[in-house]
Curated annotation (Swiss-Prot):
Similarity remark: Belongs to the dicarboxylate/amino acid:cation symporter (DAACS) (TC 2.A.23) family.
Function: Involved in the import of serine and threonine into the cell, with the concomitant import of sodium (symport system).
Subcellular location: Cell inner membrane
Protein name: Serine/threonine transporter SstT
GO BP field: serine transport; threonine transport
Membrane protein topology class: Multi-pass membrane protein
Organism from which the protein derives: Pseudomonas aeruginosa (strain ATCC 15692 / DSM 22644 / CIP 104116 / JCM 14847 / LMG 12228 / 1C / PRS 101 / PAO1)
MF terms in GO: neutral L-amino acid:sodium symporter activity
Stored NCBIfam families: PRK13628.1
Reaction it catalyzes: L-serine(in) + Na(+)(in) = L-serine(out) + Na(+)(out); L-threonine(in) + Na(+)(in) = L-threonine(out) + Na(+)(out)
Length: 409
């Protein structure tokens, strides 16, 4: 049956979501180029979309994890441990790539501006302390402030408690999870409009003029992220699944990375990743935990940002760096990156911590942070796209490897 009287509705239902997002992206660029005043006004649509994603993500994670654990049957296997290992290996590998690239293509900064009133963490111990305090946060406050470490802790605890509840209670949790998931699907259907508003307003406000003075630094940063996305991550996945990893890599970048690039929020992209995992047919008990956990600790992009900007400051100040110190920086950057979600300002405000390894004073380090905020239009977008798409990639790789191992047994 055809509906000639509704061609627009017919086109929307027949075109894939990714295709619609690409159309929204192009339309946003065109509007920003020719009608910048109008582009600034439609930015409100993008803000509404990101706010909707951020609003639904904490509730989705809480309900989904709690229902998944409560309904977990004895004997079912989850694959969280190998995924955690992949997260750590991926983050450390990204830091090593950033160190090598920074030595091969050293960047110089113009350190003159100040980013204003900020409070970077004082050391690694403070970052770890912040993470621990996040675990024992009040559950209501965790939901309100989108503290996903706290949300996970309470969801896991309640899920374990509800495993001893009646079948009626556990079925209610499953129905609640399905209801929240349906709301998420509705929100995600508005992604093309959201991307249109975000792209239009971003390019109308900043354009590319503000980035020209930092072209070399951006090339190193984005080059590292692309190298990790298309070389390092596929290599890690290949070692895990023993087949061509690129179909899976490209699917994750297309379906997850593209949305994350424009929302610039790993938390906002959690619903997108969970839906992608469902379409890939992954183990729900696994991905319902690994995806929100990955949004918190899987930070390859943050490790690259911290390392590249720190070594750019080191090169600018003429500080000599030996190999052991570079290795130590990789470790520190990896640990800092894992704690980036627990720090207001994310990876950029952890740069002073890494700079302290080289005796760089806080005043200079905060000027490096200011440079980070100037290039954040691209740096933050690319960082989030790499972080978020890798969550799905490593989850899928671990699930496939464990399934292959189980079938061979």
């Amino acid at each position: 049956m055809t509906y000639p009287e509704r061609p627009l509705l017919h086109l929307l239902t027949r075109t894939s979501l990714v295709g619609q997002i690409i159309v929204g992206l192009i339309a946003g660029l065109l509007l920003a180029s020719f009608f910048p005043a109008a582009a600034l006004k439609v930015g409100f649509i993008g803000k509404v979309f990101v706010s909707a994603l951020k609003a639904v993500a904490p509730v989705l994670v809480f309900v989904l994890v709690m229902a998944s654990i409560a309904n977990h049957k004895q004997g079912q296997q989850t694959h969280i441990r190998p995924i955690l290992l992949l997260y750590l290996v991926g983050t450390f590998s990204a830091a090593v790539v950033a160190v090598i690239a920074s030595f091969a293509f050293p960047s110089s900064l113009v350190l003159a501006s100040h980013p204003g009133e900020m409070s970077p963490p004082g050391g690694i111990a403070e970052v770890l302390q912040s993470l621990l305090l996040s675990v024992v946060d009040n559950p209501v406050n965790a939901l309100i402030s989108a503290n996903f470490i706290g949300i996970l802790a309470w969801a896991i605890g309640l899920g374990i408690a509800f495993r001893h509840a009646s079948d009626t209670t556990r079925n209610l949790l499953s129905e609640l999870s399905n209801g929240v998931s349906l709301i998420v699907k509705v929100v995600i259907r508005f992604a093309p409009l959201g991307i249109f508003g975000l792209v239009a307003s971003t390019f109308a406000e900043s354009g590319v003029e503000a980035l020209k003075g930092y072209a070399h630094l951006l090339v190193v940063l984005l080059g590292c992220m692309l190298f990790v996305a298309f070389v390092v991550n596929p290599l890690i996945v290949f070692l895990k699944i023993r087949r061509n990893p690129y179909p899976l890599v490209l699917t994750c970048l297309r379906e997850s990375g593209m949305t994350a690039f424009f929302t610039r929020s790993s938390a906002a992209n959690i619903p997108v990743n969970l839906q992608l995992c469902e379409r890939l047919g992954l183990h729900e008990d696994t991905y319902s935990v690994s995806i929100p956990l990955g949004a918190t600790i899987n930070m390859a992009g943050a490790a690259i940002t911290i390392t590249v900007l720190t070594l750019a400051a080191v090169h600018t100040l003429g500080i000599a760096v030996d190999v052991p110190t570079a290795i130590l920086l990789s470790v520190v950057a990896s640990i800092c990156a894992c704690g980036a979600s627990g720090v207001a300002g994310g990876s950029l405000l952890l740069i002073p911590l890494a700079c302290s390894l080289f005796g760089i004073p806080s005043e200079v380090a905060m000027q490096v942070v200011a440079v980070g905020f100037i290039i954040a239009i691209l740096q933050d977008s690319a960082e989030t796209a790499l972080n978020s798409s890798t969550d799905v990639l490593f989850t899928a790789a671990a699930c496939e490897a464990e399934e292959r191992k189980a079938s061979a047994a």
